[in-house]
Every structure is written in C-alpha cells, then in structure tokens.
Design a protein with these regions (language model features):
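Tight coil/turn sites that cap or link beta-strands
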Residues: 42-45, 80-81, 89, 99
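Ligand-binding loop in jelly-roll beta-barrel domains
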Residues: 75, 89-113
C-alpha cells in the first residue's frame, strides 16, 4: 500500500520560510522489493548505492526493522518507533531487512527557517536518528 503526494511549490510559499515538498507513507510485506518502482524518479534509489535529495525529509518507521546510513552517520539499525532526518545534498541510504515488514511515513520540507536550525546546531547530520 502506498500513498504519496508531491507538492508543487510556488514563489509565495518560500516567503513563509518553510515549505512542504512531499508527504506520504508506504507499507511493505516481508521480502517485498524496496523501494517500490512507483517512486517519483527524483526520489527513487537503489539501497545498495544510496542517493541525495534536495530537501530535508523526516521519516517515521511505525513497523519493521532495517538499516540506515549516511555520509555523516555510520550504518545503524532502525526499528519501529524511530524517526530519522535526511539532509539536503547529504548522501544516505536506508531499507528494511529482507525478512521484515515495513511501514514508513515521511514529510519533506525546505526553507530558510529549517536551514537556520541546522546552521545553529539544533539538528545535525551526525545525529539524524530520533526515538
């Protein structure tokens, strides 16, 4: 099951200092291919190669066990109840373990307000996991 909404930003949105770019959720059964080929081409990735994106994304795992890794964070286990933050232009990869179910929710966003939080150390690439 999948539901994704990619939001078209207009110049007025940027005046708020924070714009939503995408929101959605996906559910996978054990051994399902991940990610779904239905991903938008700008977001699809091979978990063995990883990717970079142009905005922040907060991902919330509500079911399952998997692995997360980024350029600034070594490989670590992620599980139900955890969230992780993806940073713009920061290489990352994540995926469920093959034998695990997986439910993930996410919201993507960008803007000067969140950039300032990162610049002032409130959020850090080296500490992207929350539980």
């Amino acid at each position: 099951m999948k539901s994704v909404k990619y939001i078209v930003e207009n110049p007025r949105d940027a005046l708020w200092g924070l714009s939503i770019t995408t929101v959605g959720y996906e559910c996978y059964k054990a051994n399902d291919p991940y990610p779904s080929k239905e991903h938008n081409s700008g977001y699809y990735f091979d978990p063995d190669k990883g990717r970079t994106i142009q905005e922040y994304q907060l991902c919330y795992i509500t079911e399952g066990v998997g692995t997360f890794k980024s350029a600034s964070c070594p490989s670590c286990e992620i599980r139900s109840g955890m969230m992780f933050l993806l940073f713009p232009n920061e290489w990352h990869t994540f995926s469920p373990h093959k034998n695990s179910t997986w439910k993930q929710y996410w919201i993507g966003f960008k803007g000067i307000n969140i950039d300032l939080r990162a610049e002032n150390g409130f959020i850090k690439k080296e500490k992207p996991l929350f539980n």
